């Protein structure tokens, strides 16, 4: 069969018409250098700060340095197979992590990938790790408490839902223990908890998970681990991932609590990344934007109005407020709260709980220094009964510390001074509390009532602990209805005052005489 020229040209035209050549625009670049997990890329245009960059071998990097001639990015995970000359491309999206109730009870890494050998997590929602904090109009004043279960904190340094309360102190002073007990105390309160472990040993976090499971708090908690053995980029990202998970609950009209343990290690990880990216170092070799690192994270914790919730859920949830409470932890060196990172975070947060190593070593647990520990929300975050009964505690302790220091230089003391010293010693003894022994509002209230109304005056200092234990046992078994009422409503009136007086008088007469 022979074809003429016209037939050949017709066949070619038909083939050309049938061709479907797709047109695809890609934002690609070439790796020019690889060192210590940092890659520099030439040719990327319109790349965003924090954007995910797709690498060969199904790996990703995050763009952190946007320079005129190149883009500096940090590889997430191993960079062994990444080499110069490889082609990379922008994804057009920043890092997102899975969020939702499916994560409760699980241990995940900084990217939301499960690491507890309990199978995959099927989440239908993903949030970006970086998001804008709620504006001033969207926020609501804080008027509900987060009960820590510690007498000293709930009475002197109350924490409200939506507050940012810093826990600061030297190493081994009980900072993590305080935060873990607060999480355990939320197991029946409906507050969802997120515990972010940054730069800690994996074995330490395993013990924390076991304790949460033992006290039935794990099912209400998400644990995020970026251990000391993991890369600096994951330790830097972990708090933002945890915050995104907490924001999901807040934006759906629920209350959430997040613990950052601790932000000192995140600052160190960010310093490593910044120095690798050749950013100019400042004070203590930290980069110039180290304040912004923590401020943009902690400002996302807030109590928001019902209109904000309605807007976030597109009208699905109405008439509900939500909150995200943050407990950042900062480690100090030799009690120096005036160092760079501590002063930064103190200025961002709504108060601080300062734990002192001298008090800790003296057996005062929790080792709270009431002089410089403060809550800027104050009594508005307390129930009425706690607000009324806790008023004289801080004053009594302040007077006791002043007199105790003065009495060291005086050989003879008058009766009034001696009584004040004895009262201060008893209050200090009464505020001591062991780990994993959280107290309900009712139990705290009757103890504070006993202090305020002088029921401890005739009790020896050595018997204060025994008095407290027996009083709580008596109250729980004989006045269950009153306990339930105080725990639910937190109200205080002359009727409750008379009931508490009768309980204490009967207890001292029959059970502790």
UniProtKB/Swiss-Prot annotation:
It catalyses: ATP + H2O + 4 H(+)(in) = ADP + phosphate + 5 H(+)(out). It comes from the Bacteria. SUPFAM superfamilies: C-terminal domain of alpha and beta subunits of F1 ATP synthase (SSF47917), N-terminal domain of alpha and beta subunits of F1 ATP synthase (SSF50615), P-loop containing nucleoside triphosphate hydrolases (SSF52540). Coiled coil: none annotated. One of its GO terms (molecular function) is ADP binding. Its EC number is 7.1.2.2. HAMAP family: ATP_synth_alpha_bact (MF_01346). This is ATP synthase subunit alpha. It comes from Blochmanniella floridana. The gene is atpA.
């Amino acid at each position: 069969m022979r074809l003429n020229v016209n037939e050949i040209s017709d066949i070619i035209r038909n083939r050309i018409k049938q061709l479907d050549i797709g047109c695809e625009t890609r934002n690609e670049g070439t790796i020019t250098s690889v060192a210590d997990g940092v890659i520099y890329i030439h040719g990327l245009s319109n790349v965003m700060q924090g954007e995910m960059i797709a690498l060969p071998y199904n790996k990703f990097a995050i763009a952190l340095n946007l320079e005129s001639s190149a883009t500096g990015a940090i590889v997430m995970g191993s960079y062994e197979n990444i080499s110069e000359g490889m082609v990379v491309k922008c994804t057009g999206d920043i890092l997102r992590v899975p969020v939702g109730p499916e994560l409760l009870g699980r241990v995940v890494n900084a990217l939301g990938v499960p690491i507890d050998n309990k199978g995959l997590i099927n989440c239908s929602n993903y949030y970006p790790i970086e998001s804008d904090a709620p504006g001033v109009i969207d926020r609501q004043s804080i008027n509900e408490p987060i009960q820590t279960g510690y007498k000293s904190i709930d009475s002197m340094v109350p924490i409200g839902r939506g507050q940012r309360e810093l826990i600061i102190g030297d190493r081994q002073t009980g900072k993590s223990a305080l935060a873990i007990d607060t999480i355990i105390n939320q197991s029946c309160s409906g507050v969802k908890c997120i515990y972010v472990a940054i730069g800690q040993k994996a074995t330490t976090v395993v013990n924390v998970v076991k304790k949460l499971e033992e006290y039935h708090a794990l099912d209400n908690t998400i644990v995020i681990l970026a251990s000391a053995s993991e890369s600096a980029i994951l330790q830097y990202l972990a708090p933002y991932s945890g915050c995104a998970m907490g924001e999901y609950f807040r934006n759906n009209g629920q209350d959430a609590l997040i613990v950052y343990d601790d932000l000192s290690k995140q600052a160190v990880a960010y310093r490593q990344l910044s120095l690798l990216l050749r950013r100019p170092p400042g004070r203590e070799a930290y980069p110039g934007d180290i304040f912004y690192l923590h401020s943009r994270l902690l400002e996302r914790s807030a109590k928001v109005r019902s209109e904000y919730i309605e807007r976030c859920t597109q009208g699905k949830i109405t008439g509900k407020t939500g909150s995200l409470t943050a407990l950042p932890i900062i480690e100090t060196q030799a009690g120096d709260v005036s160092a760079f990172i501590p002063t930064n975070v103190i200025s961002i947060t709504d108060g601080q709980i300062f734990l002192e190593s001298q008090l800790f070593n003296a057996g005062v647990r929790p080792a709270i220094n009431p002089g410089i520990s403060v809550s800027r929300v104050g009594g508005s975050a307390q129930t009425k009964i706690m607000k009324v009964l806790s008023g004289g505690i801080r004053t009594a302790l302040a007077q006791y510390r002043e007199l105790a220091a003065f009495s060291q230089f005086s050989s003879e003391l008058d009766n009034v001074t001696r009584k004040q010293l004895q009262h201060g010693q008893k209050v200090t003894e009464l505020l001591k509390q062991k780990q994993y022994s959280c107290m309900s509002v009712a139990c705290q209230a009757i103890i504070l009532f006993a202090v305020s109304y002088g029921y401890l005056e005739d009790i020896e200092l050595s018997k204060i602990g025994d008095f407290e234990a027996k009083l709580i046992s008596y109250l729980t078994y004989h006045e269950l209805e009153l306990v339930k009422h105080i725990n639910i409503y937190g109200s205080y009136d002359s009727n409750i005052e008379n009931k508490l007086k009768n309980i204490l008088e009967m207890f001292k007469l029959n059970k502790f005489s």
